[in-house]
Amino acid sequence: MIPGEIITKSTEVEINNHHPETVIEVENTGDRPIQVGSHFHFYEANAALDFEREMAYGKHLDIPAGAAVRFEPGDKKEVQLVEYAGKRKIFGFRGMVNGPIDESRVYRPTDENDEYAGVFGDNGTENVNKKGGKRS
């Protein structure tokens, strides 16, 4: 072993494993690029992003920590969201929550026929965020 060397497993790292996923379509209606980070409460994202906000309440992007999704002006793409875990309290961002998540507002797809369900049983291998915003 070399000092400072990091030896990692040769398997893929699974993130947000066993968290229900919701896929929504988002369009940047503004005239400037918008970037949303991995832990940003998507419900509170820039007002120039047009999407069904209530479906994003209590959720963040299903991407690795430190990553982001960028929306160029006029871009329309699908993104995959997962619920916050832990104590389920949100502070800061645009100040729209600043406290515990109101569980009655969290969209949880349960109907297989729901066009927004986007719930996959394969632990993220169908994650639309990994495919440039397009579901295959």
Swiss-Prot record:
Catalysed reactions listed for this entry: urea + 2 H2O + H(+) = hydrogencarbonate + 2 NH4(+)
Keywords from the named record: Cytoplasm, Hydrolase
Coiled coil region boundaries: none
Region (Disordered) residue spans: 112-136
Localization of this protein: Cytoplasm
GO MF annotation terms: urease activity
EC identifiers of the protein: 3.5.1.5
Family annotation (InterPro entries): Urease_beta-like, Urease_betasu_sf, Urease_subunit
Predominant location: cytoplasm
CDD domains hit by this protein: Urease_beta
GO biological process: urea catabolic process
Metabolic or biological pathway, per its Swiss-Prot or TrEMBL entry: Nitrogen metabolism; urea degradation; CO(2) and NH(3) from urea (urease route): step 1/1
Any single Gene Ontology cellular-component annotation: urease complex
Binding partners and assembly: Heterotrimer of UreA (gamma), UreB (beta) and UreC (alpha) subunits. Three heterotrimers associate to form the active enzyme.
Entry similarity comment: Belongs to the urease beta subunit family.
PANTHER family reported in the protein's UniProt record: UREASE
This protein's name: Urease subunit beta
Gene of this entry: ureB
